């Protein structure tokens, strides 16, 4: 496993397990399997409604808490709930998280960010981040933060490399964590000839080549799966390295086109939707 150093000197693994769309049962099993395989980064969120399951898996793994990098996200409807950080920690069964995000630039997101800064100062979050903040939202936050975030979690893949956003990220040393990292199941991306060719050269699948591309771009990857073999395969990407020429080949695929298009109406819905947390 490779690690990266954040702008506050904390170290974070380059690859972890994502739990988006996993039921509590699957999140528990996948988290436990991943930790046993050697994963240490686990990513969840209030809105995934599986934080308790992830927390149970961490406890049942028997792995020392300090050797796990736990990431979660505060949902938009919780930004004005002054107890939400403590409630999130309670669901996870931990005293702190290694990375705490606000999930969407919806509702009173500035109050949400102030909550992150407070959690960071109090040691309840070892690092903080923003999820889905791009364009005007990133520009506004840049003028209002008191503590620079360590991470941003956004859509990124070879068809959409976030060139414009990365100019701002590089200025502050903010790291990017990718979602839709394999193209959201787009067979066109997975079937690009360059990945088949490189897979053949290195004895890897196209998915493994794409994951390796992410890490060599400096992106942290959190592929999710409830399949133990896939979880294992996703980790098997650090025994080869793409050459500069090969990275340039992949760079030519960039269309600056995203899969997910969020609307202002959705942001309003996000601010009003309350997750039904596990009991």
Q: Residue ranges of each PLM-predicted region?
A:
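Short catalytic-loop micro-motif centered on adjacent basic/acidic residues
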Residues: 40-45, 71-72, 101-102, 127-129, ...
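N-terminal binding-site loop/beta-alpha segment at the start of enzyme catalytic domains
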Residues: 1-68, 182, 277-279
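Beta/alpha (TIM)-barrel catalytic core signal, keyed to glycine-rich beta->alpha loops juxtaposed to Asp/Glu
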Residues: 104-279
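A short, structured active-site edge motif that brings together acidic residues
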Residues: 65-78, 98-105, 132
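Acidic-and-aromatic substrate-binding clefts and catalytic sites of carbohydrate-active enzymes
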Residues: 22-25, 45-53, 75-80, 105-110, ...
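Short, acidic/polar
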Residues: 22-34, 78-93, 111, 136-139, ...
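CE4/NodB-like, metal-dependent polysaccharide N-deacetylase domain
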Residues: 81-102, 118-122
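A structural motif
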Residues: 39, 94-97, 125, 149
């Amino acid at each position: 496993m490779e690690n990266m150093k954040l702008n506050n000197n904390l170290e974070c693994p380059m690859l972890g397990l994502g739990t988006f769309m996993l039921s509590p049962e699957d999140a528990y099993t996948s988290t436990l399997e991943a930790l046993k395989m050697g994963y240490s980064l686990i990513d969840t969120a209030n809105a995934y409604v599986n934080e308790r399951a992830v927390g149970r898996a961490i406890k049942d793994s028997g792995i020392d808490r300090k050797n796990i990098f736990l990431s979660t996200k505060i949902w938009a409807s919780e930004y004005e709930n002054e107890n939400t950080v403590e409630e999130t920690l309670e669901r996870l069964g931990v005293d702190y998280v290694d990375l705490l995000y606000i999930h969407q630039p919806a509702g009173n997101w500035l109050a949400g960010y102030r909550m992150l800064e407070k959690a960071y100062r109090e040691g309840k979050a070892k690092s903080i981040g923003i999820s889905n903040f791009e364009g005007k939202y990133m520009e506004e936050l840049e003028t209002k933060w008191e503590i620079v975030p360590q991470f941003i979690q956004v859509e990124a893949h070879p068809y959409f490399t976030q060139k414009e956003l990365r100019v701002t990220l590089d200025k502050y040393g903010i790291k990017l964590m990718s979602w839709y990292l394999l193209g959201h199941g787009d067979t066109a991306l997975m079937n690009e000839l360059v990945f088949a060719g490189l897979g053949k050269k290195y004895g890897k699948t196209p998915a493994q080549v794409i994951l390796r591309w992410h890490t060599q771009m400096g992106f942290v990857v959190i592929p999710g799966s409830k399949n133990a073999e896939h979880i294992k395969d996703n980790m098997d990407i650090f025994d080869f390295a793409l050459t500069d020429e090969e990275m340039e080949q992949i760079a030519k695929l960039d269309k600056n086109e995203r899969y997910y298009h969020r609307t202002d109406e959705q942001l309003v819905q996000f601010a009003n939707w309350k997750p039904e947390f596990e009991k």
